[in-house]
């Protein structure tokens, strides 16, 4: 319906009522977000993939939170190391702080295993092809620095 289209087009734009969402999606897709009216709906491309359940080998689990970070080392399903460290990513503008905190956690966990077969990461945000498109943890890192990494 063209009335709904015009409404959505008006609110999801720069200076529109939903400018935050427009800007967010523009960052995710790396181009200005736009509302498009079409008569043709593309065919769905769903391809379900079973994930998880792998307990064999040497694995690291990492959770990047807003006030702490957690990391665990697991060998053949048994936890061999686990730590929780207070950190402040949401209020820190220096990208080295983030990088060093994450690398330190991963290296510490890895030091408790003979090798690393897999790393699983949990963090709020949108990640595409191992690239951080948007993440609340890096709110204070300027875009000029953020997109260098």
Predicted regions and their residues:
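Short hydrophobic beta-strand segments
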Residues: 1-2, 61
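Short amphipathic alpha-helices and their capping/turn segments at secondary-structure boundaries
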Residues: 58-61, 100-116
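Short, small-residue-rich loop/turn micro-motifs
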Residues: 75, 123-125
């Amino acid at each position: 319906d063209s009335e709904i289209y015009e409404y959505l087009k008006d609110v999801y734009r720069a200076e529109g009522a939903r400018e935050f969402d427009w800007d967010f999606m523009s960052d995710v897709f790396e181009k200005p977000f736009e509302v498009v009216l079409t008569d043709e709906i593309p065919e769905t491309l769903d391809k379900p993939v079973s994930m998880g359940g792998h307990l064999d080998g040497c694995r690291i689990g990492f959770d990047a939170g807003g006030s702490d970070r957690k990391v665990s080392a697991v060998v053949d399903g048994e936890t061999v190391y686990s730590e929780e460290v207070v950190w402040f990513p949401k209020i820190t503008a220096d990208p080295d702080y983030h990088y060093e905190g994450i690398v330190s956690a991963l290296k510490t966990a890895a030091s408790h295993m003979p090798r690393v077969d897999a790393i699983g990461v949990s963090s709020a945000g949108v990640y595409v092809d191992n690239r951080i498109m948007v993440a609340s943890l890096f709110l204070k890192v300027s875009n000029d620095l953020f997109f260098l990494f």
